[in-house]
Design a protein with these regions (language model features):
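C-terminal and late-domain segments of enzyme folds
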Residues: 24-61, 72-79, 84-87, 92, ...
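Twin-arginine (Tat) signal peptide motif
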Residues: 2-10
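Portal/gating segments that form or line small-molecule/metal binding sites
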Residues: 66, 72-115, 121, 128
């Protein structure tokens, strides 16, 4: 190869490397967490300072926030969460609710999501969320919100729905861990099953049967008043209690407290925690 040809080849390879680096920067590759955006996944119970964490992640009190209360048994007027957020200084809070899938698929209904910086999904029963929104424009707009760097938070049912496998999805009884027809979550945290209220309801090992049936899943069990902040493949624990990470059906559980971090992709303590 001539010197000129070699130079051109080097320039060509450098251009490919630069383009690849730029593409990875714009579309980072992750194995579990969202490539863009942030998740706040709360184990239920009293929120306390976790509301301030949510508002900080959302970009402050002026950010547009949408509250989705559909997991509740009934939604009569504004959900109490809107008042809580306003009391803490949020000034642009909107409620979004329907049980009509055709409405959930409409552009007009989803309009608030397109300008929102953050979304909060309240507690209740997670099957109501999938019946209303799974596979609709609402779910696609939530994914788009994350893709533009937004924040999705939720507690209890609003936590479990963020996993890919929906535990306790049975409309009959929330003690049923696997319910055919209600086993798919929104999948913001991929290849995962998320449980909540672990400490107060004696659920420390309830995820084991799910993981034996679906061994590719990462199990995440959250105490009340406790959360993980997920950015990319890293989860940081915040709050009062513990978070249990089950990397495999029979593997030892990793129990983390506030300030500790877990690598969701590698399924081990992150280097920051070690």
């Amino acid at each position: 190869m001539s010197r000129r040809g070699a130079l051109l080849r080097c320039l060509f390879l450098a251009a490919i490397a630069a383009a690849t680096s730029a593409a990875e920067e714009n579309n980072p590759v992750t194995r579990a967490g969202p490539p863009r955006g942030t998740l706040l996944i709360v184990g239920g119970g009293a929120m306390g300072g976790l509301w301030d964490v949510f508002l900080r992640l959302a970009g402050g009190k002026e950010s547009e926030i949408v509250v989705i209360p559909t997991a509740a048994t009934t939604v009569d007027g504004e959900d109490a969460v809107l008042g809580v957020l306003r009391t803490r200084g949020a000034v642009r809070v909107t409620q979004l609710h329907t049980r009509d899938r055709s409405a959930a698929d409409s552009e007009a209904f989803c309009a608030p999501l397109r300008s929102a910086k953050a979304v909060w999904i309240t507690g209740g029963r997670q099957w109501r969320l999938t019946d209303a929104y799974l596979g609709t424009r609402v779910q696609r707009e939530l994914e788009a919100l994350l893709a533009r760097g937004g924040v999705i938070g939720g507690s209890s049912a609003g936590a479990t729905i963020q996993g890919s496998y929906l535990v306790r999805g049975s409309p009959r009884d929330n003690r049923i861990m696997m319910s055919p027809g209600h086993e798919e979550g929104f999948g913001f945290l991929r290849a995962s099953a998320i449980d909540q209220h672990v400490d107060t309801r004696g659920r420390a090992d309830d995820l084991r049967p799910v993981l034996r049936a679906h061994p590719a899943l990462l199990g995440v069990g959250l105490d009340e008043a406790t959360a993980i902040i997920v950015r990319g493949d890293e989860a940081e624990v915040v709050g009062k209690g513990q978070v249990r990470f089950f990397p495999a059906p029979e593997a030892a559980v990793h129990v983390l407290r506030a300030g500790e971090r877990f690598d969701l992709g590698a399924r081990r303590l992150s280097t920051a925690s070690r």
